[in-house]
Design a protein with these regions (language model features):
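Hard-cation-handling environments
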Residues: 54-143
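C-terminal motif of bacterial Sec signal peptides marking the signal peptidase cleavage site
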Residues: 41-44
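Generic hydrophobic, helix-prone segments enriched in Leu/Val/Ile
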Residues: 15, 72-79, 192, 201, ...
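N-terminal secretory signal peptides that target proteins for export/translocation
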Residues: 1-29
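Feature captures C-terminal
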Residues: 48-60, 115-117, 123-277
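Sec-dependent signal peptide recognition
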Residues: 30-35
Length: 277
């Protein structure tokens, strides 16, 4: 079997970017990956076999280990393709976006982008728009720099394969969402404002209107959080659950590309949407 064809069949370039970023920084890990690739090739090209015994052994890898030039040459074409894709500049940012609480430049930016992109998709499908977006601070894995932002940086920010979903919540469930935000001293939020007092959410406004517990609200989030991740149990048993068939990371990339084509740049900022006393 042709080795290059085998690698093409086995590797999804985009899905493995985050691992590749680690690989670039870790010489020992690079050696281990080389060993695993060789094992994969021999396994794929061989007839069916059964394991009859296992004999463990130690393979010492450190920064004095020589690179395997054959494996390096095999990987190089795919590394080049990956580098070209990840180095694409998506947009310029007028300021650094960083995490923080109760609100932050990064949390506000990503929540706003996610709500905007989600409503674009819903509008094209003639579906009701979402009212708010709520994400989690733990899902934002790095800051975004001032200046050029490339695809690779968004993969660092969002290395997960989380999908964007829209949940329709009862007023009671939505109240639980805001209570969670208050107890957490803030989460990435868009479309709503509130004040945190003694770990309670007060003066809640959604779309400029006072929160009404008798109404239902449509919330954009990730499938991970919608499934109860980070103990967000208020998302359990929603009135409705819609999958938008777009990854959270891709929604961010799509927005940045589109805004850049319009000649726009990012302006990360805080605006008082979550106040803590």
């Amino acid at each position: 079997m042709n080795k290059k064809k085998l690698i093409e069949n086995r590797l999804n370039v985009r899905s493995y970017y985050y691992f590749y970023a680690l690989l670039k920084k870790n010489h020992i890990l690079k050696k281990l990956v080389s060993f695993l690739i060789i094992a994969l090739i021999f396994n794929a090209c061989s007839n069916k076999m059964q394991v009859t015994s296992i004999q463990p052994s130690s393979i010492q890898l450190n920064n004095t280990s020589a690179e395997d030039e054959a494996i390096k040459a095999l990987i190089e074409p795919y590394k080049s393709v990956l580098d070209n894709e990840m180095n694409e500049v998506l947009i310029n940012s007028n300021a650094e976006a960083v995490k923080g609480q109760p609100e932050s430049t990064l949390g506000n930016l990503i929540a706003d982008i996610t709500l905007w992109e989600s409503n674009n998709i819903l509008q094209k499908k003639n579906l009701p728009l979402a009212d708010i977006c709520m994400l989690n601070n733990g899902g934002l894995r790095t800051s975004l720099p001032e200046g050029k932002i490339n695809v690779g940086k968004i993969f660092e920010l969002m290395p997960f394969e989380n999908e964007v979903v829209v949940l329709t919540l009862s007023g009671e469930k939505a109240q639980g969402l805001f209570k969670y935000i208050a107890k957490s001293n803030g989460m990435p939020l868009s479309g709503a404002t509130l004040e945190i007092k003694d770990e309670n959410a007060e003066n809640i406004f959604i779309g400029g209107k006072a929160f009404d517990p008798s109404k239902t609200y449509r919330v954009v989030t990730s499938d991970y959080l919608a499934g109860g991740g980070d103990k967000m149990r208020f998302f359990n048993e929603p009135i409705a659950y819609q999958v938008l068939n777009v990854k959270l990371r891709d929604a961010i990339i799509n927005y940045m590309r589109a805004e850049n084509k319009k000649g726009n740049s990012l302006n990360p900022k805080t605006d008082g949407r979550i106040k803590s006393n």
